UniProtKB/Swiss-Prot annotation:
It comes from Staphylococcus saprophyticus subsp. saprophyticus (strain ATCC 15305 / DSM 20229 / NCIMB 8711 / NCTC 7292 / S-41). It holds the Pfam family Ferrochelatase. Fe(2+) binds at H181, E263. GO terms for molecular function: ferrochelatase activity; metal ion binding. Fe-coproporphyrin III binds at Y12, R29, R45, Y46, S53, Y124. Its EC number is 4.99.1.9. The gene is cpfC. Its main location: cytoplasm. It is found in: Cytoplasm. This is Coproporphyrin III ferrochelatase. It is an enzyme of class 4 (lyase). The keyword Metal-binding applies. It catalyses: Fe-coproporphyrin III + 2 H(+) = coproporphyrin III + Fe(2+). Involved in coproporphyrin-dependent heme b biosynthesis. Catalyzes the insertion of ferrous iron into coproporphyrin III to form Fe-coproporphyrin III. Pathway: Porphyrin-containing compound metabolism; protoheme biosynthesis.
Length: 307
């Protein structure tokens, strides 16, 4: 007999329409409304990438692809999909409540972020678990999947494809910039958080498995809190690498993200490219994982480790 269990896929969330932006930004800021200038700055960024982020649709497609792949991988279990978002509806708590209403008493949770931090993946899991405890739902949490061979294979293939478009004699003048979303430095250090080390391990694995010669690690998209965040920022790193090594090609792999959204389309494709153009060097950014079977397969393999 097939058993039905829940699959809770959690993600950051993004505004569905322009009128959602203020409430969304306020939620990110823990209930503190943005100033008019701050709100306009965010609206301008969205306009620059085409109006709104494609994240909402991509999250749904990724979640559906994962559900389908899991239902193919397991013979005796049927996974029922629920999507819970951090900063906009359907919120994480809404998804767990829907599970309860559907009679789900067991579920697997996964966040669409490959590296673990207590301030990112950990906070999603805590919110989900707190709500699940109200209803007696048992959760198995996926904490990370950056180390899964299929995840590394995806990025290795994309790096090698990008290198293939660069003349062979310029490979030694090419650098791979491996990055993830920055987080407050003090909190990371105080809690001995594994997040920076997980990015470092990812960079090492990509260096080992791909044809790239030079690799650098950076952070991006830091918040404006007035306190130090993990660095170096990828923009500062780009200038420093050029000044020291005179690299001619920069390949940006924002491996902490799993699809194209504001942080990639603006922070990489605009801000980093502006610096590359200013320096007279070539900007490259391989395709993000989205619903690629290797990426989805990496999460499936990690779920097999917990359920």
């Amino acid at each position: 007999m097939t058993k039905t269990i829940g699959l809770l896929v959690m993600a950051y969330g993004t505004p569905y329409k322009e009128s959602d932006i203020e409430a969304y930004y306020t939620d990110i800021r823990h209930g503190k409304k943005p100033t008019e200038a701050e709100l306009q700055d965010l609206k301008d960024r969205y306009q620059f990438i085409g109006g709104l982020s494609p994240l909402a649709g991509t999250t749904n497609r990724q979640a559906e692809s994962l559900r389908d792949a899991l239902n193919q991988a397991y013979d005796d279990v049927e996974f029922k999909l629920y999507i819970g978002l951090k900063h906009i509806h359907p919120f994480i708590e809404d998804a767990v409540q829907s599970m309860h209403e559907d009679g789900i008493d067991e579920a697997v949770t996964v966040v669409l972020a490959p590296h673990y931090s207590s301030f990112s993946v950990g906070s999603y899991n805590t919110r989900a678990q707190k709500e699940a405890d109200k209803y007696g739902i048992t959760f198995k949490h996926v904490e990370h999947y950056y180390q899964q061979p299929k995840f590394i294979q995806y990025w290795t293939e994309k790096i090698n494809e990008t290198l293939a478009d660069i003349p062979q004699d310029e490979h030694d003048k090419t650098v791979l910039v491996v990055s993830a979303h920055s987080l407050p430095k003090g909190l990371i250090e105080k809690n001995n958080d594994p997040y920076p080390n997980e990015l470092h391990e990812t960079a090492q694995l990509l260096e080992q498995h791909s044809n790239i010669i030079h690799v650098a690690e950076g952070w991006q998209s830091e918040g404006n809190t007035g306190t130090p965040w993990l660095g170096p920022d990828v923009q500062d790193l780009t200038r420093a690498l050029y000044n020291e090594h005179k690299y001619e090609h920069f390949i940006y792999t924002p491996v902490g993200f799993v699809c194209e959204h504001l942080e990639v389309l603006y922070d990489n494709d605009y801000e980093c490219k502006v610096i590359c153009d200013e320096l007279g060097v070539h900007y490259h950014r391989p395709k993000m994982p989205d619903t690629d079977p290797l990426f989805i397969g990496a999460i499936v393999e990690e779920i097999k480790n917990v359920y």
